[in-house]
């Protein structure tokens, strides 16, 4: 899965049962964490400060209290200034309330470091989704733009392995979801390169499952795809998580619970795929605009304002880097040379930045990079200086 080791935004954890552990001194102190069960018992309103994530272990709630608890919790989550990762931790036999739409439903045996990594992954995914929606709203669609095969198609689930439970996975999926089977990891990667899948289930013996997951995760196109692994022994759960599983299904799962977990993974996978598609589309469009003199100042200003407001709701700042040649000690002697230098600077910034960072040419401004964190500006500055030191422009 994505290698994410730092939070996109920091804050307290809201938790019921399982309390995520911290791994960085930069995290909010533990005494700011919110025990949801305690707040529910007191009938209190939750703080307005945006949490880093919300984690609810369903076993911490007595059966008869669950509906009341979620009736109290969900409206308060909805009223938060921005969406945050929301997790339900469960087991094979737990009964999950209907109507929940968490970011993910995960086996409660997930190791602490994997849970933290998933929080990091999902935080970034939410930022990418916000960025995709913003670009579509500000820049619109590109007429006739074709999508990459792994972004195209209807909502689909890929089942990898020869367990003989293919019909069970079809039965557990929503009616409109197409379920496709693959014998092994190589076949899975081949299928995934030709059409979109929103989630993968690996239903194979432990050693094969690890091998198949690693084949999938090695391909950068599928690093963020939800992958659910099936196992028979509880002692294998942690190993599968650490080898790339987004969730692990152990033993016989209650049919309704299995459907909840599968559909949650599919929902997140589809959302991520659509965001990837829009970001890829806008990337091509922004590159095309270079030949037309760049993005208009009015469009760019509207983007900056909307993006800044969205990040501020999460306590984040927007970092704009003007990439004019003079900022790097370069002097252009002609308009043709200036165009070449701008192209070089944009190419360096494009290769160094993330998909959710905006890199473009703006009319009257020149090349710019709009980054979502300060570390990105330092990294980009160093990269540009390093390349320019060894490049004759």
Regions from the PLM with identified roles:
Residues 66-72, 91-105, 211, 232-248:
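Alpha4 helix (beta4-alpha4-beta5 surface) of REC/receiver domains from two-component response regulators
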Residues 63-82, 210-223:
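Short amphipathic alpha-helix used as the core "switch/output" element in two-component signaling
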Residues 34-53, 61-62, 183-199:
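Acidic, metal-coordinating helix/loop segments flanking the phosphotransfer/catalytic sites
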């Amino acid at each position: 899965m994505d290698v994410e080791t730092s939070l996109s935004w920091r804050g307290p954890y809201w938790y019921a049962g399982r309390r995520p552990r911290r791994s960085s001194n930069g995290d909010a102190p533990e005494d700011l964490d919110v025990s949801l069960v305690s707040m529910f018992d007191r009938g209190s309103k939750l703080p307005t400060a945006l949490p880093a994530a919300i984690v609810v272990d369903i076993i911490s709630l007595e059966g008869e209290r669950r509906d009341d608890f979620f009736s109290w919790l969900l409206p308060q989550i909805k009223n938060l200034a921005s969406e945050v990762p929301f997790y339900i931790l469960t087991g094979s036999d737990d009964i999950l309330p209907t109507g929940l739409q968490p970011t993910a439903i995960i086996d409660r045996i997930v190791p602490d470091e994997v849970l933290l990594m998933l929080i990091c992954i999902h935080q970034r995914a939410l930022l990418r989704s916000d960025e995709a929606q913003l670009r579509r709203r500000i820049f619109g669609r590109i007429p006739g733009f074709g999508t990459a095969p792994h972004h195209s198609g209807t909502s689909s689930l890929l089942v990898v392995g020869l367990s003989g439970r293919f019909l069970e996975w079809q039965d557990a999926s929503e009616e409109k979801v197409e379920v496709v089977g693959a014998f092994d990891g190589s076949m899975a990667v081949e299928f995934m390169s030709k059409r979109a899948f929103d989630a993968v289930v690996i239903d194979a013996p432990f050693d094969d499952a690890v091998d198949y997951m690693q084949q999938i995760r090695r391909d950068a196109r599928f690093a963020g795809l939800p992958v659910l692994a099936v196992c028979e022994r509880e002692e294998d759960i942690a190993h599968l998580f650490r080898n790339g599983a987004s969730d692990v299904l152990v033993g016989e799962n209650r049919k309704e619970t299995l459907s909840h977990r599968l559909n949650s993974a599919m929902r997140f996978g589809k959302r991520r795929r659509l965001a990837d598609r829009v970001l890829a589309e806008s990337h091509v469009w922004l590159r095309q605009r270079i030949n037309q003199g760049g993005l208009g100042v009015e469009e760019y200003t509207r983007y900056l304002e909307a993006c800044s407001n969205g990040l501020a709701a999460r306590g984040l700042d927007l970092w704009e880097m003007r990439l004019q040649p003079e900022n790097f000690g370069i002097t252009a002697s002609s308009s043709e040379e200036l165009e070449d230098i701008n192209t070089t600077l944009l190419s360096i910034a494009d290769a160094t930045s993330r998909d959710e960072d905006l890199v473009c040419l703006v009319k009257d401004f020149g090349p710019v990079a709009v980054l979502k964190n300060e570390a990105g500006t330092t990294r980009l500055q160093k990269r540009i200086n390093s390349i320019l030191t060894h490049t004759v422009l």
